[in-house]
């Protein structure tokens, strides 16, 4: 993909964040999500790609826009797109930290077509890459990652969703002496954060959404991190969907290269609320300021865009 597309993709996630961020703290998660979807879909109209949504808002009968299989873009190279217009709709509704607008783009056929079900994951940044094995205990993984990173176990920070299903993992990590940062929603954001030195996130573990696992893998692919995962179908219907998506063995350990099947990936995310890495949207009379990360796997480049937007210039977000 042309590297100049990186800025175009940044504008897409900025549009989603700017539109939905107006509903911060107002308890309207569905309305915020709708605004983000509308803005993202509109912004795609000016991007010079022929894109197909592979991971999006749901099946064609579940979502009016950005549904799986929808074609977007103004024409150009064929790409597959993974989007989450808002990761953390509850976070926006409650005015809490960690909400982002996020997308990733790969050459055609570049993504695992992850079904909408649970996925067990373990993620690390570049310094921990190669040290994880999802078939081993959390204790072994923490110890191996700590050794690879040159840290003591009690200096390792793990992020996991605050869910009852993770209580056993929490106890195991704490008994070992590792530190846990619990989050209420959204595991793409911390996976992105563990890629960057100084974010304070070293590992992301636990079970979350499978589509989010692919987006997390995109960030890790771009920045040199690592992930292992396993799908966790809950019934026969979900097993059937795994088979339809090309996953014949639902117990298969999925590596980074299984989730992201190309070296040509661009990842972009804009903060809506504050994170460990990105600053929140700041609105002011006549405009706003956003903080965006854009990563490209071919070069390993990570860019942070601190951007001022003027309302009178942003009527349509069409190419200028």
Regions found by a protein language model. Give the residues of each.
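General beta-strand structural signal in soluble alpha/beta enzymes
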Residues: 53-57, 81-83, 92-94, 113-114, ...
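Short acidic, glycine/serine/threonine-rich loops at helix termini
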Residues: 65-67, 94-96, 114-117, 168-174, ...
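A generic local secondary-structure boundary/capping motif
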Residues: 70-71, 89-93, 145-150, 170, ...
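DPxDG-like acidic metal-binding loop motif
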Residues: 77-87, 91-111
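Acidic beta-strand-loop-alpha-helix segment within the catalytic core
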Residues: 102, 107-182, 245-248, 275-282, ...
